[in-house]
Amino acid sequence: EIRDVVSEDTIVVSIAPGKKLAWMEGLFEKPLKIVRTMPNTPALVGEGMSCVCGNEKCSSEDVNTVCRIFAGFGKTEIVEEDMIDVVVGVSGSSPAYVFMFIEAMADAAVADGMPRAQAYRFAAQAVLGSAKMVLETGKHPGELKDMVCSPKGTTIEAVRVLEEKGLRSAVFE
């Protein structure tokens, strides 16, 4: 639809997952500046994590312009194109996994008698605070996990159950 209206100095920004820069270049009859991006849904609340990658026609200033736009709804990093599909799994799709985890924690709290709205607040805040600890302390997530686990405690028991049930392998797959 935009093929006939874009000029060679226009930066075309794509959020289409799985569509490579070369494929997008083939859609146009003239060489254009194309930036491939992958935002995620936390951008809706200003906490998105997006990646950007420009084609050979893009200057670093072109790519930085797109980064500044995307910074308006979260953080942005420049990546090589072969990393964009990796970003889909680790950032683009992962909010759904986190929502499932929050829901499961809240369901467990509800099963123990906590009102659902309160359970969601506790579970979501725990995830938010934990994420901030990873980002702000610079400590390895395993080290932070170990800080919560005490010998023969309820947390290490819960970690054992999560390991037995295959949390890591499910995420890794």
List the model feature ranges, each with a label:
Residues 1-52, 56:
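Rossmann-like NAD(P)(H) cofactor-binding subdomain of soluble oxidoreductases
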Residues 17-18, 39, 81, 95, ...:
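Alpha-helix N-cap/helix-start capping motif
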Residues 124-173:
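NAD(P)-dependent Rossmann-like dehydrogenase/reductase catalytic/cofactor-binding core
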Residues 34-35, 84-89, 141-146:
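Short pre-catalytic strand/loop immediately N-terminal to key active-site residues, enriched for Gly-Thr
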